[in-house]
Amino acid sequence: MSLINIKKNISDVQAPDALLKKLSAALAASTGKSESYVMTLLDSGVPMIFAGSEEPCAYVEIKSIGALTPSAMSDQFCELIKMSLGISKDRIYIEFDDVNAANWGWNGRTFG
C-alpha cells in the first residue's frame, strides 16, 4: 500500500528495472512497510516543462497509507533520482499523499 510514480521528460534510462527495484526497496524501508505491497512506476519521455525550461525534470508522486515523512523522504528520493537519472534536485517536484485505507483497493477489497 505504497506507490512511487515518476514522470520525467527524458527518454533513455540505463537499466530501468534496476532503478524500479531500487525505488521499491527505498520506499519500503522509508515507510517501514513490506516491499510486497510496494508498486513503482517510471514514465519516460513525458512532454514536460519546469521553470520555463525543457531541461531534464521529473514529477514524482509518493502515496502510502500512513508512514510518510515528507521532509526526510523528499531529500532521500531527490538524491536517488539525481544519482540514477542525472536530474538536478531543483528540477524535481514530489507530491506526497497519505491515502485513507478505505480509498486504496487491492485483491478485490480495500485496506480499510
Report each predicted region and the residues it spans.
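Interaction-mediating elements
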Residues: 1-112
